[in-house]
Amino acid sequence: ILRVSKQAGDGGIERFIRRDSIMFVNARFLIDKFAKDENVKTVIYGHAGHINPISSYPAVPCIPFGRYMRKAYGESYSPLLFLIGSGEAMAYDEHYNRKDNWLSSPPENSMEYFLSLIDDNVFYTPLTVDFNELTLSRLQGSHHIPQEFYPFNLYQRFKGVFFIKSTDCTHI
């Protein structure tokens, strides 16, 4: 790990851009060490901007962790997306203080709005070819920012969606 860290360089931006490749090196090491058999499944929980195999948009442009995983494991790599319709989310403010903020209401043309029309509070749905188009979806990172919704082709990025209609920071 120290060798990989040294290869990432000393500059903050360099290290930030290379973090997904370092995530992959660490994940591959652990998978090869503990889950090499094909019948063993591995679950890796990560941010949607990292786990998808397409792009880190709208964050800092870099090759996402998911692209390295897809190249190494092919279609066996199945990234899943977690979305929340409404409620509170924990993130940091500009001074790195932890804050619970209310999520903005999903716009009518967003995936969260569409999924909120379903009666269940928590459910999973696969992303079929019917979703092969640009649609707005929430991207919440480590910091609260005013813009929460961005256009994505979720079908190309994820195999399915776990949706939570409403939550606060302590209850689902």
Task: Give the predicted meaning of each segment.
Residues 1-40:
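A charged, amphipathic alpha-helical module
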Residues 52-172:
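C-terminal regions of proteins
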Residues 47:
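Catalytic core of tubulin tyrosine ligase-like
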Residues 39-41, 75-76:
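Residues that mark the start of a beta-strand
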